[in-house]
Amino acid sequence: MAKEDSIEMQGTILETLPNTMFRVELENGHVVIAHISGKMRKNYIRILTGDKVTVQLTPYDLTKGRIVFRAR
């Protein structure tokens, strides 16, 4: 997937699911399932409930996403 094809949105972690998946509520109120990107996994970035994150969504499936950034 090319970078310009993805949609980036801000969201908040609602709950942690198995296999490093998270339920994220986006700014517009939609709830999506997201997993951690490879660079975040490699650098051991920990994500907890309530964290503000940036999620990349693909235009093909707007119910799944990838967490690419955790706000401090």
UniProtKB/Swiss-Prot annotation:
Organismal lineage: Bacteria, Pseudomonadati, Pseudomonadota, Gammaproteobacteria, Alteromonadales
Family: Belongs to the IF-1 family.
Record-given protein name: Translation initiation factor IF-1
Keywords: Cytoplasm, Initiation factor, Protein biosynthesis, RNA-binding, rRNA-binding
Gene name linked to the record: infA
Molecular function terms, GO-annotated: ribosome binding; rRNA binding; translation initiation factor activity
Listed SMART domains: S1 (SM00316)
Function, in words: One of the essential components for the initiation of protein synthesis. Stabilizes the binding of IF-2 and IF-3 on the 30S subunit to which N-formylmethionyl-tRNA(fMet) subsequently binds. Helps modulate mRNA selection, yielding the 30S pre-initiation complex (PIC). Upon addition of the 50S ribosomal subunit IF-1, IF-2 and IF-3 are released leaving the mature 70S translation initiation complex.
Organism whose genome encodes this protein: Shewanella amazonensis (strain ATCC BAA-1098 / SB2B)
Subunit details: Component of the 30S ribosomal translation pre-initiation complex which assembles on the 30S ribosome in the order IF-2 and IF-3, IF-1 and N-formylmethionyl-tRNA(fMet); mRNA recruitment can occur at any time during PIC assembly.
Primary localisation category: cytoplasm
InterPro entries: NA-bd_OB-fold, RNA-binding_domain_S1_IF1, S1_domain, TIF_IF1
GO cellular component terms, A-Z: cytosol
Entry superkingdom: Bacteria
SS bond partners: none
S1-like domain boundaries: 1-72
SUPFAM superfamilies documented for this protein: Nucleic acid-binding proteins
Localization of this protein: Cytoplasm
Keyword rRNA-binding tagged: yes
